[in-house]
Amino acid sequence: MKTLRWFCAAALAVAVGVPSVRAQEPPKPGPEHEQLKKLEGTWEATMKYMGQESKGTMTYKMEVGGLWLTSNYEGDFAGAKFYGKGFDSYDAGKKKFVSVWVDSMITTPMFMEGTYDKEKHTLTMTGEGPSPAGPTKFKSVTHFVDDNNIQMDMYMGDAKDPGFTITYMRKK
């Protein structure tokens, strides 16, 4: 009984002594999120990798209060079904775009971050992800040709030429 009285007294002291806590105002989408929102929709994808070409479909959707662009990729790669999922946003604290990618060929996510060049309409991101040789540095350069066409080049390690290229064309 003495312990219960002590606990109640301590709880009352904390409740009276602590100013009321308000819910923090959630972040609101900024101009960078609006840039990502332009990608919403379904895109036909063509991937070129080591002389081979494969096709797929990428679907983008803004979610989580307009703060995250989710992407779902379905297609084929080297004759096998391939699935991928991405999460892209703008980190206002870092002042950088951020990305997480997972797919049916890896069990370790790829994390990337980078900046957007408004004049060149290009998003350049760097990060590290899995490869057959172990953790590898990656760089993606995504050029927004116009509202309906995108080209993404992915560089691995210190390569001067892209390891693969994906072109996207918005489905009408």
Feature roles, as predicted:
Residues V18-A23:
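Sec/Tat signal peptide C-region and signal peptidase I cleavage site
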Residues C8-G17:
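Bacterial N-terminal signal peptides
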Residues Q24-K172:
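Hydrophobic small-molecule pocket/channel-lining residues, especially in calycin-type beta-barrels
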Residues M1-C8:
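Bacterial N-terminal signal peptides that target proteins for export
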